[in-house]
Swiss-Prot record:
InterPro entries: Ribosomal_uL10 (IPR001790), Ribosomal_uL10-like_sf (IPR043141), Ribosomal_uL10_bac (IPR022973), Ribosomal_uL10_bac_type (IPR047865), Ribosomal_uL10_CS_bac (IPR002363). GO terms for molecular function: large ribosomal subunit rRNA binding; structural constituent of ribosome. It holds the Pfam family Ribosomal_L10. Forms part of the ribosomal stalk, playing a central role in the interaction of the ribosome with GTP-bound translation factors. GO terms for cellular component: large ribosomal subunit. Gene3D superfamilies: 3.30.70.1730, 6.10.250.290. It comes from the Bacteria. Part of the ribosomal stalk of the 50S ribosomal subunit. The N-terminus interacts with L11 and the large rRNA to form the base of the stalk. The C-terminus forms an elongated spine to which L12 dimers bind in a sequential fashion forming a multimeric L10(L12)X complex. The gene is rplJ. The keyword RNA-binding applies. This is Large ribosomal subunit protein uL10. GO terms for biological process: translation.
């Protein structure tokens, strides 16, 4: 049964909002997935805080253009599903892991904070550690010089105190 114009407009509006709200969207060809595998993928994406949508390519293209994304049309061929996420790494990582496991899907492209990226860049994104790990590494890199500086000051202060103590003992011995 064909969908009505109102239903199409609702789908376009929903996809447009998702393209605008999500920091990342990954487009994948889901050809060959059976229902059980699709359900498993949706569950994994949901656990990672992502959403998985399937819509007609023409509606997806219209929604992308309305959201200000030009140039997505060449990737909208064949059965395409979109994984939306707030964490820039999560959808790419979940899809890449799932593809390695099942060998049934193919990443076509992605949208990262309003910029269209190709499949290679999406795979590179999937190889990044999660945001929290990256922040911890940056913070650790910033703290290391401070700890070194504090240690150097502590050592200098300790030597100064030992010198004062030696002078005090020497003066006490002379008196």
């Amino acid at each position: 049964m064909p969908i009505t114009r109102a239903e199409k407009e609702a789908i376009i509006q929903e996809l447009k909002e998702k393209f605008k709200e999500a920091r990342v969207a990954v487009l994948a060809d889901y050809r060959g997935l059976n229902v059980a595998e699709a359900t498993r993928l949706r569950r994994r994406l949901r656990e990672a805080g992502c959403e998985f949508k399937v819509a007609k390519n023409t509606l997806t293209g219209l929604a992308a253009r309305q959201a200000g994304l030009e140039g997505l049309d060449p990737y909208l061929e064949g059965p395409i599903a979109i994984a939306f996420g707030v964490d820039p790494v999560a959808p790419a990582k979940v899809l890449s892991d799932f593809i390695r496991e099942t060998r049934k899907m193919e990443i076509k492209a992605g949208v990262l904070e309003g910029t269209i990226i190709d499949a290679r860049r999406v795979r590179d994104l999937a190889d990044l550690p999660p945001r929290e790990v990256l922040l911890a590494r940056v913070l650790g890199g910033m703290q290391a010089p401070l700890y070194g500086f504090a240690g150097a000051l502590q050592g200098t202060l300790r030597k100064f105190i030992y010198a004062l103590e030696a002078i005090r003992k020497q003066k006490a011995g002379e008196a």
